[in-house]
């Protein structure tokens, strides 16, 4: 059977626990939203096949736990990322204030070759809560923060209502492509999982 070659782009979603990282990922990939909150343990990822400018590529979206005790997992998961998405809850000042910590954490752990130009995207989520009346972080304040960090693209979303989720991820995909650190993924029509129990090196010298 013939095989296909695709470009693999790795995207990392970071932010405090409970800001809606998993919901954003599920809304984009599966067009689904669940009101039942379940904290991500460690990290999880979903993939979506996307076509852009006559190119077929696979977007691999990593959803990492927001709890500090899991930040030590960062090196393995952050390395090789093509774009980093910083998410906060517009109804939580703390989650917004922590964006800088998450950005710095990523740059330290991922150690990109060109940190000044590495693509970030910021998402202010949960704009649907209480009809927007409970928000405590203004769009103006968020955009000012993004401008100060090198004009980071900014989106306000509702994972629950699907507002601006598609638009945000379109920009994420485009920025990931521009990063230039693309990996070619060889995808055969059948996948041999017979040796899946054998450990694989992450390249980390521990």
From Swiss-Prot:
Signal peptide positions (record): none
Stated role: Protein transport. Probably involved in vesicular traffic.
Annotated family: Belongs to the small GTPase superfamily. Rab family.
Keyword vocabulary terms for this entry: Cell membrane, GTP-binding, Lipoprotein, Membrane, Methylation, Nucleotide-binding, Prenylation, Protein transport, Transport
Name of this protein: Ras-related protein Rab7
Superkingdom: Eukaryota
Disulfide bonds: none
UniProt subcellular location: Cell membrane
Entry GO CC: plasma membrane; vacuolar membrane
Lipidation (S-geranylgeranyl cysteine): 204, 206
Residues holding GTP: 15-22, 63-67, 125-128
Alphabetical GO biological process terms: protein transport
The species this protein was found in: Pisum sativum
CDD domains, per database record: Rab7
Membrane topology: Lipid-anchor
InterPro entries the record matches: P-loop_NTPase (IPR027417), Small_GTP-bd (IPR005225), Small_GTPase (IPR001806)
GO molecular function terms listed in the Swiss-Prot or TrEMBL record: GTP binding; GTPase activity
Gene3D superfamilies recorded: P-loop containing nucleotide triphosphate hydrolases
Cysteine methyl ester, modified sites: 206
């Amino acid at each position: 059977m013939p095989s296909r070659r695709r470009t693999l782009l790795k995207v990392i979603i970071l932010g405090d626990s409970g800001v809606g990282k998993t919901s954003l990922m599920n809304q984009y990939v599966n067009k689904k939203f669940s009101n039942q909150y379940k904290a991500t343990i460690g990290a999880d990822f979903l993939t979506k096949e996307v076509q852009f400018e006559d190119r077929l590529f696979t977007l691999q979206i990593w959803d990492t736990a927001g709890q500090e005790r899991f930040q030590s997992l960062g090196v393995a998961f952050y390395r090789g990322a093509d774009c980093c998405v910083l998410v906060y809850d517009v109804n939580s000042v703390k989650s917004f204030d922590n964006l800088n910590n998450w950005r710095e954490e990523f740059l330290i752990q991922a150690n990109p070759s060109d940190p000044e130009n590495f693509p970030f995207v910021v998402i202010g989520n949960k704009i649907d809560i209480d009809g927007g009346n409970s928000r405590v972080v203004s769009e103006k304040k968020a955009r000012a923060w993004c401008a100060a960090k090198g004009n980071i693209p900014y989106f306000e979303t509702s994972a629950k209502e699907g507002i601006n989720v598609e638009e945000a991820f379109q920009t994420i995909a485009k920025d990931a492509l521009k990063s230039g650190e693309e990996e070619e993924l060889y995808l055969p029509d059948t996948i041999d999982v017979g040796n899946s129990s054998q450990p694989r090196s992450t390249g980390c010298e521990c």
